[in-house]
Structures are given as structure tokens and as C-alpha cells.
Amino acid sequence: MTSATRSQVLSLYMRVFRIARGWQSTLPQDTESERRYIVQEAQTLFRQNQQLTDHTSIKKCIDECEARIEIGLHYRNPYPRPLYLPIMGLATQKGRKLKAQQRMRKQAKPVYLQSHDEDS
């Protein structure tokens, strides 16, 4: 990781904590739990991706973080937006059709959910 990339990642990490510190929920009783969620989510995802060394995968994670920040601030919602599967995305198939479904699901996954598993 270059020093420029490292400083960009660290500034994003600190930006997330600054956002969490000043976060105001639309419902006042949920403010504290949403602040905790923002901090825990940032810690989890940054630790999960700290071993990355490939520049393109690091760039994807940076783009994901920036997208999550912008979406969260715009909608005033710290939780990831739901993922809608394409048509025929859940039908059970076998062989080539199954591979096509898996490819459709992967292509339909937005940039702000790349670090999340399909099961979670």
C-alpha cells in the first residue's frame, strides 16, 4: 500500500468516526444505537479488509466506503440499503443456468455492498 493510499484510508476511517460522533437520528431515541452501529460497522469492515495489498481491491473498498458515507448522509440512515435481486435471481437451477444466476446476482450487487456476504 502506498503512503497516499494509506493516508486516504486513514482519513476515511477518521471521517466515519467524526460522522458517528455527530450523528443525529430521525428518531431521537435511536441516535445512540445508530452511532454504535456506525462505529461497529466501520471497525468490522476496516479490520476485514486490512490485509489487502492489491491496489485495485483497495480502491474498490475505498469507493465502497465513500458510497456508504454519501448514501448514509443523504438518506439519514446508517444501515445499508436493501439489495434487490434481478428477475430469476432466486430460482433454483442446475449447471449452466445456475452459473448464469450466480453471475446475475454478482453483477446486480451495488458498490456499497461489496464487503457484505450474501447471507448476512
UniProtKB/Swiss-Prot annotation:
Signal peptide range: none
Give the highest taxon in the source lineage.
Answer: Eukaryota
One GO cellular component, as annotated: mitochondrion
Enumerate the residue ranges of region (Disordered): 101-120
Alphabetical list of InterPro entries matching this protein: Complex1_LYR_dom, Complex1_LYR_LYRM1, LYRM1
Pfam families recorded for this chain? Complex1_LYR
Similarity field:
Belongs to the complex I LYR family.
Q: What is this protein called?
A: LYR motif-containing protein 1
